[in-house]
Amino acid sequence: MAILSRLLTTVTLGSLLTSAVAQSSGCGKQPTLTNGVQNINGREYILNIPEGYDSSKQYKLIFGLHWLGGSMNDVVSGNSIEPWYGLESRAEGSAIFVAPNGLNAGWANNGGEDTALMDAIIEAVEADLCIDQSSRFATGFSFGGGMSYALACARASKFRAVSVLSGGVISGCDGGNDPIAYLGIHGINDPVLPIDGGIEMANKFVQNNGCQSADVGRPNSGSGQSVRTDFQGCSRPVSFIAYDGGHEGAPLGVGNPLAPDATWEFFTGA
């Protein structure tokens, strides 16, 4: 019984320490940040704090990254997509959202400058608001997908999962050797960033996560359907959804639940 008691005590203390480590320094503080445009290091981002924010409760932190020619405002308003890629409504107050503005309406990430922006935003937000530091996520379409991929490569230790919508290796991949939960969503007829490139990106994390290799399924062209491939044996989950479509920020049409549902379920299950 004494041994069992010591074991239980060790487990309990370990759980408490893990919880404490995952809790940002902003927990328990009266926040100074407010909803709307924030400035940091000469760059801008839009912050969305849920109504009824409670500084004693830990929130997920979700980055929504815009496409080439888009802006942080487009992510927030839902211009050609659902607002916040459809994730805010699904979060039901459980997440704080950030939409940064890229330079020249994109994410070239020269010298890692956009990765550094995400680092700075994380530091500022978490110093002021209560974030579960084990629950940071990023998603984006096209160039925003490329930047999400770059974060998966360079900041796998900071982010729990990414969802890459019709992305390409266009924001770099510094590092790219560590495991992270990875979801790719791509149109089979994408004329801008072809699906084969998207599959290659996912396969990097199939390898990093120790998954069993598998062929990615694809729907028939003109079917209006999607096919999901969940890789097996992974240390962290890797999935890929191929859908009947092109280069679209809202796969199968604005309001279709495919990408928002898949992304939210993937993030919460990762």
UniProtKB/Swiss-Prot annotation:
The keyword Secreted applies. It is found in: Secreted. GO terms for molecular function: feruloyl esterase activity. It catalyses: feruloyl-polysaccharide + H2O = ferulate + polysaccharide. SUPFAM superfamilies: alpha/beta-Hydrolases. Its main location: secreted. Its EC number is 3.1.1.73. InterPro entries: AB_hydrolase_fold, FaeB/C/D. Residues 1-22 form the signal peptide. Keywords: Carbohydrate metabolism, Hydrolase, Polysaccharide degradation, Secreted, Serine esterase, Signal, Xylan degradation. GO terms for biological process: xylan catabolic process. GO terms for cellular component: extracellular region. Belongs to the faeC family. PANTHER family: FERULOYL ESTERASE C, PTHR38050. Involved in degradation of plant cell walls. Hydrolyzes the feruloyl-arabinose ester bond in arabinoxylans, and the feruloyl-galactose ester bond in pectin. Active against paranitrophenyl-acetate, methyl ferulate and wheat arabinoxylan. This is Probable feruloyl esterase C.
